[in-house]
Amino acid sequence: MNQPSIALIFNPTARGNKAEKFRKWLGELPNDVKLIETTAPGSASGLAAQAVEDGFRTIVASGGDGTINEVVNGLSGKKTKIDKVLLGILPLGTMNVFARELGISLSIKRAWETVQLGYSRKVDLPLVKLQTTSGAAERVFIQMIGAGLDGDAVGNVSISLKRKVGALAYLASTISALQRKPPKLKAYWDEGSAEGEWMCVGNGKMYGGPFKLFPNAIVDDGKLDLCVLPKVNKRIIANAAIAMLRGRLNYWPNVTYHRVSRLTIEGPPNTLVQADGDYVGTLPLDIKVLQQRLNVLVPRENQD
């Protein structure tokens, strides 16, 4: 029997209709796929790194943006040559922002066809230094990182509510976060600086599902897009959400955009930070771009 050539990492305890269909679909996979089950939150990183050490060169992350983030952090470790690895994506999450960004189908079977066809694209990998409960840490993210309102909302979201109602749990948490006083933030980069009460940095265009928060962002140009809201309150956020739904937030006078290759964001040290939809730590942030560092399997029309 041939040795498996693809490692597929998935969460065996995932709930919901899509997860149930996925488990049934697993039985249809060919023998060249090794199934690797996560054992706890965060375990996907170590499993991905071990899979590469075991000789696998195609690693498939099955889950949402948080799972993909974990897998990519495992692939980007010092002992892993990430440029020699292909990342496949089977989107099973709440938002699936990274999959949408790269045009990967939200259908598991069609996403698997993308993995099998083998077309790839090199995308940028942002590297961030931040504070965690264990002290200073360094990690990568794939799509976006935010400090202020969305960090607060993600950091305090009810996990039980998220399991029941999905994306609506984030809306409830955002409404709750708006009751609290927003932090005063400042960003610095070589060409300038900005101040505001909410800041989000995008590697690609998409945010929160199908919405384009960063309409001019490109995932492989060596640049990040910084979105700044000078003030945060219920009225401003409601108007910003409407503008984003219409795809016109970049024309809105109450928001500013800046294109950078590296930057620092500072603010109150207890300011929560989210990356790819998961809480990851607190300020300050130092971010830089590792250009075209990650090889992702994509539909033929989106390949390099």
What do the predicted segments below correspond to?
Residues M1-S62, N69, N73, Q303:
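ATP/NTP phosphate-donor binding region
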Residues D150-A153, E195, Y207-P210, K234-I237:
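Short acidic/glycine-rich loop or secondary-structure boundary segments that cap or lie
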Residues K181-P183, E195-E197, D220-D225, R259-S261:
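A generic structural signal for short beta-strands and their flanking turns/coil linkers
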